[in-house]
Amino acid sequence: RNKTKLIGILNLTTDSFSDAGSYIDISNAKKHIDQMIEQGCTFIDIGAESTKPGFRDIDVSTQIKKIIPIIKYIKSINQEISISIDTRASEVADLCLEHGASIINDVSGSTHDEQMLSVVSKHNAEIILGHLPKEHQKKDLMISSDILFTLTKYFDQLISAAETYGIDNTK
């Protein structure tokens, strides 16, 4: 049995480094979703806030207004598609999980919003923990004499924190 999954990305931002706002218009976003599914994607990651170096915060209500209609559209055409939400905001995560997302992709590793792990646990969802410490959010910089040690320590702490909320680290 092949466990390989094709993951599609849908950036709903004007300042995305990968697609420069191509999917701000909902009809373009829907066409892109249809195309990703036709090409075999079984997992779609949706984000409404860029996290490229020097990004600006997008308020929660704007993120929700962009993402919820997309989740509803995906679920209306294919219930089997796994949906992850790329957000650092627990309020966005909470509403998106209520509407059918099952995974939160938090580039900050849950360090931006102290309620994130609680929300993920409440929904028995999965979380992708990224590395974007606060000191790196405004510039693309990481200084370490031993990068592997630094990252291992960072992720060990995040995983331990997630486990204290009952989040299964084997998912």
What are these regions (language model features)?
Residues K5-L6, I77-D86, S102-I103:
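Short beta-strand/loop segments at the ligand-binding rim of alpha/beta enzyme cores
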Residues F43-D45, S84, N105-D106, I128-L129, ...:
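Conserved beta-strand positions in the central sheet of alpha/beta enzyme cores
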Residues L10-N11, I83-E91, V107-S110:
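Glycine-rich beta-to-alpha transition loops that act as phosphate-gripper elements at the mouths
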Residues L10, M36, G40, I44, ...:
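Conserved, mostly hydrophobic/aromatic
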Residues S18-I37, T62-K65, G109-E114, F149-D156:
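Glycine-rich anion/phosphate-binding loops
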Residues L12-S16, T51-G54, A93, H99, ...:
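Conserved anion-binding
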Residues S16-S18, T42-I70, I74:
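Glycine-rich, proline-tolerant flexible connector loops at the mouths of alpha/beta enzymes
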Residues E38-C41, E80, A101, N124-A125, ...:
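A structural motif
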